[in-house]
């Protein structure tokens, strides 16, 4: 189950940070939100007054080959991955916005007032049944991680992964071998659940929630009989405090941003691309170009630092356009990791099949050798703001 889009598209970074502060000013989340608000102001001045780090071109060319050579150099030791629903679609999990196949286009049977209601906290508290029916269809544990997930696992194994910031709630990063310390699950997770009552907040494990969902029993707290909700971020809820606290330190020392499978439309997650030092290279692996901001809006609203793939001033951003799995295979081949990656996927999928008793590989995530496409060129490709991931 992929990202639940926990803020409306028209919300700005500042508005979301303020929401995080207002939600609980005495909590860790409130403190983290305050730090994020200061970071927002610092970012605004940095973008408008050219303060902070200097622009230095670290890529010898703005291609996938250039990124691979940089990754093999001593300059690249810490990689941050920013990922969205597009890295899980090959596992059989729908994204949210793709026409006809996206989740929002396939919710008619739940008789919602509008598609987004299924992830609104106010609607959930009154009508939890649609969400739990959907959760049964897309429950974590029914899918296997993709090549993208295992590419991030390779980064971890090789000591290159600083952090993975994920918008997804499908827990596939964990199944692939990333640990709690490796992850910032920006939109929450199914891994734990809590009673929605503010006076109770009893915690329940994944196994408890799974049993309730698959028995088609609306989960109720054993202590107070209030609803129990997975710890995913609904519309109307603040992002986890960990998102803001990790952001403060991680982006000061990152050497490469690897952005995969996201349209970068949802704030404040989308603003993460602007948090890195001005010299830090950024690679986008996605079906469409994303993250290209309007310079005027960036200056006025503090959302600067957008991707620049095509202008004469471009110096650090590279777009590889296509399926995320194929992009990771292409990059792995350039790094000399392709066989290692394919072997890892085969081995891990076989282990998952053995544990589940299935014994039959899932064709949607099979890592059978495929001819990697040539690295995508940087031809212009129009991306509208509302295009799907």
From Swiss-Prot:
It comes from Homo sapiens (Human). The gene is SIRT2. Interacts with CDC20, FOXO3 and FZR1. Associates with microtubules in primary cortical mature neurons. Homotrimer. Isoform 1 and isoform 2 interact (via both phosphorylated, unphosphorylated, active or inactive forms) with HDAC6; the interaction is necessary for the complex to interact with alpha-tubulin, suggesting that these proteins belong to a large complex that deacetylates the cytoskeleton. Interacts with FOXO1; the interaction is disrupted upon serum-starvation or oxidative stress, leading to increased level of acetylated FOXO1 and induction of autophagy. Isoform 1 is expressed in heart, liver and skeletal muscle, weakly expressed in the cortex. Isoform 2 is strongly expressed in the cortex, weakly expressed in heart and liver. Weakly expressed in several malignancies including breast, liver, brain, kidney and prostate cancers compared to normal tissues. Weakly expressed in glioma cell lines compared to normal brain tissues (at protein level). Widely expressed. Highly expressed in heart, brain and skeletal muscle, while it is weakly expressed in placenta and lung. This is NAD-dependent protein deacetylase sirtuin-2. Residues 1-34, 351-389 are annotated as: Disordered. Changing residue 53 to A: Reduces deacetylase activity. It is an enzyme of class 2 (transferase). GO terms for cellular component: centriole; centrosome; chromatin silencing complex; chromosome; chromosome, telomeric region; cytoplasm; cytosol; glial cell projection. It catalyses: N(6)-acetyl-L-lysyl-[protein] + NAD(+) + H2O = 2''-O-acetyl-ADP-D-ribose + nicotinamide + L-lysyl-[protein]; N(6)-tetradecanoyl-L-lysyl-[protein] + NAD(+) + H2O = 2''-O-tetradecanoyl-ADP-D-ribose + nicotinamide + L-lysyl-[protein]; N(6)-hexadecanoyl-L-lysyl-[protein] + NAD(+) + H2O = 2''-O-hexadecanoyl-ADP-D-ribose + nicotinamide + L-lysyl-[protein]. Changing residue 372 to A: Reduces phosphorylation. Does not inhibit interaction with HDAC6, ubiquitination and deacetylase activity. Inhibits deacetylase activity. Pfam families: SIR2. Keywords: Acetylation, Autophagy, Cell cycle, Cell division, Cell membrane, Cell projection, Chromosome, Cytoplasm, Cytoskeleton, Differentiation, Immunity, Innate immunity, Meiosis, Membrane, Metal-binding, Microtubule, Mitosis, NAD, Neurodegeneration, Neurogenesis, Nucleus, Phosphoprotein, Transcription, Transcription regulation, Transferase, Ubl conjugation, Zinc. Inhibited by Sirtinol, A3 and M15 small molecules. Inhibited by nicotinamide. Inhibited by a macrocyclic peptide inhibitor S2iL5. Inhibited by EP300-induced acetylation. Its main location: nucleus. The lineage of its organism: Eukaryota, Metazoa, Chordata, Craniata, Vertebrata. The keyword Nuclease does not apply. Residues 57-338 form the Deacetylase sirtuin-type domain.
């Amino acid at each position: 189950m992929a990202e639940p889009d926990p803020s409306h598209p028209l919300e700005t970074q500042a508005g979301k940070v303020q929401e995080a502060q207002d939600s609980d000013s005495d909590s860790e989340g409130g403190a983290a939100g305050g730090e994020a608000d200061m970071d927002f102001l610092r970012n605004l001045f940095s973008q408008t007054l050219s303060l902070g780090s200097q622009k230095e071109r670290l890529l010898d060319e703005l291609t996938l080959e250039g990124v691979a050579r940089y990754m093999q150099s001593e300059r690249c030791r810490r990689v941050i991955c920013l990922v969205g629903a597009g890295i899980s679609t090959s596992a059989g999990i729908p994204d949210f916005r793709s026409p006809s196949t996206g989740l929002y286009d396939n919710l008619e049977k739940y008789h919602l007032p509008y598609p987004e209601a299924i992830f609104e906290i106010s609607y959930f508290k009154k009508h939890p049944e649609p969400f739990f029916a959907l959760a049964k269809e897309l429950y974590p544990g029914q899918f296997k991680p993709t090549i993208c997930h295992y590419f991030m696992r390779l980064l971890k194994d090789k000591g290159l992964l600083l952090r993975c910031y994920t918008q997804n709630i499908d827990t596939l990063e964990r199944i692939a071998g990333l640990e709690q310390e490796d992850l910032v699950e920006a939109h929450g997770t199914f891994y734990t659940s809590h009673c929605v009552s503010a006076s109770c907040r009893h915690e329940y494990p994944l196994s408890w929630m799974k049993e309730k969902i698959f028995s088609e029993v609306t989960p109720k707290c054993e202590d107070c009989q209030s609803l129990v909700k997975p710890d995913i971020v609904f519309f109307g809820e603040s992002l986890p405090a960990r998102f803001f606290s990790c952001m403060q330190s991680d982006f000061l020392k990152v050497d490469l941003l690897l952005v995969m499978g996201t349209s970068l439309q949802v704030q404040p997650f989308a603003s993460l691309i602007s948090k890195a030092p001005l010299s830090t290279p950024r690679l986008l692996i996605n079906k469409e170009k994303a993250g290209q901001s309007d310079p005027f809006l960036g200056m006025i609203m503090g959302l600067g630092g957008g991707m620049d793939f095509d202008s004469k001033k471009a110096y650090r951003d590279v777009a590889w356009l296509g399926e995320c799995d194929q992009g990771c295979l292409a990059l792995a081949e350039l790094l000399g990791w392709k066989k290692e990656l394919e072997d890892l996927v085969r081995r891990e999928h076989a282990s998952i099949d053995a544990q589940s008793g299935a014994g039959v590989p899932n064709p949607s995530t099979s890592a059978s050798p495929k001819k990697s496409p040539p690295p995508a060129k940087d031809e212009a490709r129009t991306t509208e703001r509302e295009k799907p991931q």
